[in-house]
A protein has these predicted regions:
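Short glycine-enriched loop/turn motifs at secondary-structure junctions
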Residues: 1, 31, 48-52
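Amphipathic alpha-helical interaction surfaces in cytosolic regulatory modules
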Residues: 11-27, 35-50, 64
């Protein structure tokens, strides 16, 4: 499992993010404080505080580099 910080600060970004990660069979979790939700769940994402960066846990080693490229617009430096 590897983690990166992402920012999802608009409805369009959330929809785009979920559409992109739904193309992968891997599991993804979003971690915000003490809450951990399935990153493929739009309803779950909207239950988080989206005003701050969120930690994305990627449970895949073989697709990691490709996933990072696809999600580059959401990743916080």
């Amino acid at each position: 499992m590897k983690t990166v910080k992402i920012r999802l600060d608009s409805i369009d970004k959330v929809k785009d993010f979920v559409n992109k990660i739904s193309n992968y069979d891997s599991d993804f979790d979003l971690i915000s404080g003490r809450y951990v939700i399935d990153a493929k769940s739009i309803m779950g994402i909207f239950s988080l505080d989206l005003s701050r960066p969120i930690e994305l846990a990627i449970h895949s080693d073989e697709d990691y580099d490709e996933i990072i490229k696809v999600l580059a617009t959401f990743i916080e430096e």
